[in-house]
Amino acid sequence: MKPNYKPPFSRFVKKVHKPLQLAIEDAAEEVCDNPEIGEAKAGDLAGIWVYKFKFNRQEYLIAYRPPTPESRRQGVDVELLMIDFYQVGSHENFYGELKRYLKSER
């Protein structure tokens, strides 16, 4: 599956130092290899999944939306399916910022 990085995700990655950028890239690749590796959210964030990883004893979260099961069942080539990566960051204000971005995107 291919990653599709949304602006908040890309902005955060640009601002951080190289070792963390590489850790984020590795985590995104893990998600692309297995989209169900994270935890599905409910309520306001239904359809969004969050994958947690650690870097230098700090926990980071990646919010993403995997392809729907219907699109996977329809025989679409796995390499053509996109995973939308919305946000990455530490837990502080993560969900509030994510909700604000998703609301503005609609």
Label for each model-derived stretch:
Residues 7, 43-44, 89:
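A general secondary-structure junction signal
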